[in-house]
């Protein structure tokens, strides 16, 4: 799910501005210029579903968003791995994706009705959702990419350790950077390439350790999660262009992307015959599949809302840092809650990936080119040459 960061810049422009109830009442007796100033200082709206966090201070908004991200996505990862521990479930990752998409359709309908109820009021069940903003042909592309991302990601767990899957997800910068250079002709700074290099080294080391420690390691899982990353990287470009051009709310994008993705996958599974075998297996284990699948889907859907709120309140770099920390905690929980072999190579390679993510976040605020590096080296050399200690050492 791509996250639009335009709201975060609006938040930065209005930081520290809070309007009290008394101030709002006194605005009616103020001159027009004062009323205009009061309106312009209103903080940007921040909502998580039907909960309005607009008039909380920024620290409270940040803490609430962080708490939601950590709790929901740690629960999401735990339930995802728990479902795949059910004996005989590993071949049915695509059916889990179908169940997840079905739940997302229901959640999306409820969210769109909540938005309509908040805007127009009236009876909740008689609310008509807002008309679609983005053309259907764009959603057909988004649905295919969403299906590739979620389906390949879920199915890869049948062949990979969960920590390995998470490490791959941390390295989405690599396909994004390569695709942006080849397709859009973008230019990146030195820190971006350093970040991608660290991620590649850490990822290769982690995968090598996993292949040595895990007896059921399969390169098909690596291919699946790599395909999921490529689809996820493409989703960002398509969603960014569509949401900015047509001013579509995120609830609409989620609803149509997963709704059409459900139709795609349902037809494919009917044609291949995998639907009936997956459905029969889930009927034999309804709690472990449909029950856990509901909580798994609900935590993922709500997690998207909290990440969006975190981006709007604190900005994309901070949101990226928080989600990276969440992934590190998820990996730690995976080793603690599910028995699996461990080696220190996991730790060191994971730290290299984290370094790459930090460099990527740092580069968003501090653009560094090769010319900047040469300039700083010259400045450092000149400073050392003028240093008294340097002169003393030469004289000795």
From Swiss-Prot:
Identify one Gene Ontology CC term for this UniProt entry.
endoplasmic reticulum membrane
Residues covered by region (Disordered): 22-42
* Keywords associated with the record: Developmental protein, Glycoprotein, Golgi apparatus, Membrane, Phosphoprotein, Transmembrane, Transmembrane helix, Transport
Q: Where is this protein found? A: Golgi apparatus membrane
**Any stretches that span the bilayer, and where are they?**
66-86, 91-111, 140-160, 163-183, 189-209, 216-236, 253-273, 290-310, 318-338, 342-362
Q: Where in the sequence does glycosylation occur per the annotation?
A: 57
Residues with the modification Phosphoserine, per the entry, are 37, 40
Q: Name one GO biological process term.
A: transmembrane transport
Q: Which InterPro entries does the entry link to? A: SCL35B1-4/HUT1 (IPR013657)
Q: How does it sit in the membrane?
A: Multi-pass membrane protein
Q: Where is the composition biased (Polar residues)?
A: 27-42
Pfam families referenced in this protein's UniProt entry, alphabetically: UAA
Tell whether Transport is among the UniProt keywords. Answer: yes
Q: Which GO terms describe its molecular function?
A: 3'-phosphoadenosine 5'-phosphosulfate transmembrane transporter activity
**Free-text function comment from the UniProt entry:** Mediates the transport of adenosine 3'-phospho 5'-phosphosulfate (PAPS), from cytosol into Golgi. PAPS is a universal sulfuryl donor for sulfation events that take place in the Golgi. Essential for viability. Involved in glycosaminoglycan synthesis and the subsequent signaling. May be involved in hh and dpp signaling by controlling the sulfation of heparan sulfate (HS).
For this chain, the family text in UniProt reads: Belongs to the nucleotide-sugar transporter family. SLC35B subfamily.
What is the protein name given in its UniProt record? Adenosine 3'-phospho 5'-phosphosulfate transporter 2
